[in-house]
Amino acid sequence: MIIVTGGAGLIGSNIIKALNDRGHTDILVVDNLKDGTKFANLADLNIADYMDKEDFLIAILADEDFGNVEAVFHEGACSSTTEWDGKYMMDNNYQYSKELLHWCLEHQVPFLYASSAATYGGRNADFIEERQYEQPLNVYGYSKMLFDHYVRDILPEAQSQVCGFRYFNVYGPREGHKGSMASVAFHLNTQLKNGENPKLFAGSDGFKRDFIYVEDVASVNLWFWENAVSGIFNCGTGRAESFQEVADAALKYHQSGDIEYIPFPDKLKGRYQEFTLADLTKLRAAGYDKPFKTVAEGVADYMAWLNRNA
């Protein structure tokens, strides 16, 4: 069996799809379906079982027998960068992850987990997987950084695979449940489909992010699992592309609309990463050599998927 926490979310459900494509269907999905709309991300996938995340944690703490577990992909977390309830964030993203990590180490189960580029904070260069480059801007980024530090301390003695991925700006199929936290590409498509002009923050040609297509993220996860590589790795494309380029790709697909520029919100000032760019030195040195989709390629693919599945 393979366990995927956050399996009904964007990255988790795409990992399940990639596993299905490789013939794996004995999959336990762990999630919180209080937001029932997330079921749609699993509707076309083949899984063996589902557990609520609270019930799963109780089972882990009680050391219940899950049989032969081949891997745990831990994608479940509160991923809202605008959530400021620190206790909730630390319980969800830090304590829960520690419990699951220790269960995996005890049972010699490969543990692959979601970290985040939010650990780097507001820097504009050197997004490198080392302590001196980490200074998060929000409690979400802090919770991810703290767990990475915990993992770093454990790695030298770990007898089974422990692998973290610092996801950069992930977008693609199965993110419709995320609301305001969905990608710019998702929101632009919705606006264009509704006959509206797509909206960007003023200055978006200068805001550059490392946008990575979610299928590429799933590919990275499965390659590292199959090759039993441990460590903490950036998961981005190694390119910084502007929000303007995302909008241009959406407009090209829809063949309509003009961009409207709206003022940058005061509440995000000083808490917003204006630039991200994954340093892929460690990822490539580990042996992952597949290319990553550009924004033009990924957004075109995503627009086709969104409008095919509307």
From Swiss-Prot:
Cofactor: record remark: Binds 1 NADP(+) per subunit.
Reaction(s) catalysed by this chain's protein: ADP-D-glycero-beta-D-manno-heptose = ADP-L-glycero-beta-D-manno-heptose
Named cofactor requirement(s): NADP(+)
InterPro entries: Epimerase_deHydtase, Heptose_epim, NAD(P)-bd_dom_sf
Binding site for NADP(+): 10-11, 31-32, 38, 53, 75-79, 92, 144, 170, 178
EC number: 5.1.3.20
Keywords: Carbohydrate metabolism, Isomerase, NADP
Domain of life where this protein originates: Bacteria
Stored Gene3D superfamilies: NAD(P)-binding Rossmann-like Domain, UDP-galactose 4-epimerase, domain 1
CDD domains named in the record: ADP_GME_SDR_e
Amino-acid positions noted as binding substrate in the UniProt annotation, renumbered to this chain: 169, 180, 187, 201-204, 209, 272
Pathway connected to this protein: Nucleotide-sugar biosynthesis; ADP-L-glycero-beta-D-manno-heptose biosynthesis; ADP-L-glycero-beta-D-manno-heptose from D-glycero-beta-D-manno-heptose 7-phosphate: step 4/4
Keyword Isomerase carried by entry: yes
Active-site positions on this chain: 140, 178
NADP keyword on record: yes
GO biological process, one term: carbohydrate metabolic process
Gene Ontology molecular-function annotations: ADP-glyceromanno-heptose 6-epimerase activity; NADP binding
Pfam families: Epimerase (PF01370)
Quaternary structure, from the entry: Homopentamer.
Family to which the UniProt record says this protein belongs: Belongs to the NAD(P)-dependent epimerase/dehydratase family. HldD subfamily.
Description of its domains: Contains a large N-terminal NADP-binding domain, and a smaller C-terminal substrate-binding domain.
Function: Catalyzes the interconversion between ADP-D-glycero-beta-D-manno-heptose and ADP-L-glycero-beta-D-manno-heptose via an epimerization at carbon 6 of the heptose.
Protein name (database record): ADP-L-glycero-D-manno-heptose-6-epimerase
Native species: Erwinia tasmaniensis (strain DSM 17950 / CFBP 7177 / CIP 109463 / NCPPB 4357 / Et1/99)
